[in-house]
Amino acid sequence: MRIGHGYDVHRFGEGDYITLGGVRIPHKHGLVAHSDGDVLLHALSDALLGAAALGDIGKHFPDTDPRFKGADSRALLRHVVAIVAEKGWKVGNVDATIVAQAPKMAPHIETMRGLIAEDLGVALDQVNVKATTTERLGFTGREEGIAVHAVALLMAR
């Protein structure tokens, strides 16, 4: 078994929605990113790659590569799962914490879990997503952006 940790941050910018866990959520701002800015899936991808000792998403999908401009992070996550599987690993479970003052995540968590489970090829009970605020402290509390921490457990295939 192997454990990996992922962390990602994106700042708010222009737009009227964000994409988290594959779910489009209306919001007064968008997230600034080279891809679709899905900070949740980026952190999960990093956790999976880290557990398999395969670097991070920047190594596999550099933001300097125009092929990944506006990329669908669900497709990137599925590619990460394939890379990890090629090295002999399968997902045991994943757990993520979204750190954001706004928008409210609770109405979207179950949909996120379902999409992530689908992309990972695992059962719903192998995926956990939760959200918290920082009580208006720091950059997330000032609503300047969103951060996500994620952990992944990999098991030998």
From Swiss-Prot:
Family membership noted in the UniProt record: Belongs to the IspF family.
Annotated site, Transition state stabilizer, chain positions: H34, T133
Gene name tied to this protein: ispF
Gene3D superfamilies on file: 2-C-methyl-D-erythritol 2,4-cyclodiphosphate synthase (3.30.1330.50)
Annotated protein name in UniProt: 2-C-methyl-D-erythritol 2,4-cyclodiphosphate synthase
InterPro entries: MECDP_synthase (IPR003526), MECDP_synthase_CS (IPR020555), MECDP_synthase_sf (IPR036571)
Oligomer status and interactors: Homotrimer.
Reactions that this protein is recorded to catalyse: 4-CDP-2-C-methyl-D-erythritol 2-phosphate = 2-C-methyl-D-erythritol 2,4-cyclic diphosphate + CMP
Cofactor: a divalent metal cation
GO biological process, one term: isopentenyl diphosphate biosynthetic process, methylerythritol 4-phosphate pathway
Binding site for 4-CDP-2-C-methyl-D-erythritol 2-phosphate: 8-10, 34-35, 56-58, 61-65, 100-106, 132-135, 139, 142
Cofactor binding note: Binds 1 divalent metal cation per subunit.
E.C. numbers: 4.6.1.12
Entry binding sites for a divalent metal cation: D8, H10, H42
Protein task: Involved in the biosynthesis of isopentenyl diphosphate (IPP) and dimethylallyl diphosphate (DMAPP), two major building blocks of isoprenoid compounds. Catalyzes the conversion of 4-diphosphocytidyl-2-C-methyl-D-erythritol 2-phosphate (CDP-ME2P) to 2-C-methyl-D-erythritol 2,4-cyclodiphosphate (ME-CPP) with a corresponding release of cytidine 5-monophosphate (CMP).
Residue ranges that the Swiss-Prot or TrEMBL entry lists as coiled coil: none
Pathway: Isoprenoid biosynthesis; isopentenyl diphosphate biosynthesis via DXP pathway; isopentenyl diphosphate from 1-deoxy-D-xylulose 5-phosphate: step 4/6
Gene Ontology molecular functions: 2-C-methyl-D-erythritol 2,4-cyclodiphosphate synthase activity; metal ion binding
Keyword set, alphabetical order: Isoprene biosynthesis, Lyase, Metal-binding
